[in-house]
Amino acid sequence: MGKITFYEDRGFQGRCYECSSDCPNLQTYFSRCNSIRVDSGCWMLYERPNYQGHQYFLRRGDYPDYQQWMGFSDSIRSCRLIPHTGSHRMRLYEKEDHKGVMMELSEDCSCIQDRFHLSEVRSLHVLEGCWVLYEMPNYRGRQYLLRPQEYRRYHDWGAVDAKAGSLRRVVDLY
């Protein structure tokens, strides 16, 4: 069970809304989000309703203003509780439709270019666990939640291009 609290103002002030499950539309509960407290679980937040737009991965902790979660604005319109699993495994492909060179991964990877000599990933197959793909090395840039399924093209995980810099397993460390 997860628990996240959204606050309209910085520093955990103003109107707040507590959530414990996926919510495709948070607009009815608050108009802006400037701080967040994650009491339990790992969460993916989305800039727009129905799990669209920029994505922000948060684990347990306090985020006193939106820059703390690398937000571009105070707009959070949907959220998803990420299920915890024990093992993680995925396959990266250099070409669409799971073609070309394939690399398998079961641990975090801070730099895909250094490890696999790839700057772009055109398709993925997440076999176990949930992952966050970052467009830049060292877990920076745009973030994309990857759940167990096949992603035949980078559009399938919500990206605008095939840039892939780093990958991190979703693990609740507490």
Curated annotation (Swiss-Prot):
Q: Which PROSITE patterns match?
A: CRYSTALLIN_BETA_GAMMA
The answer to whether keyword 4Fe-4S applies is: no
InterPro entries given in the database record: Beta/Gamma-Crystallin, Beta/gamma_crystallin, G_crystallin-like
Assigned keywords, A-Z:
Eye lens protein, Methylation, Repeat
Annotated region (Connecting peptide), positions in chain: 84-87
Which family is annotated?
Belongs to the beta/gamma-crystallin family.
Note what the entry says on domains. Answer: Has a two-domain beta-structure, folded into four very similar Greek key motifs.
Stated name of the protein: Gamma-crystallin C
Provenance organism? Rattus norvegicus (Rat)
Upper classification of the organism: Eukaryota, Metazoa, Chordata, Craniata, Vertebrata
Q: Which gene encodes it?
A: Crygc
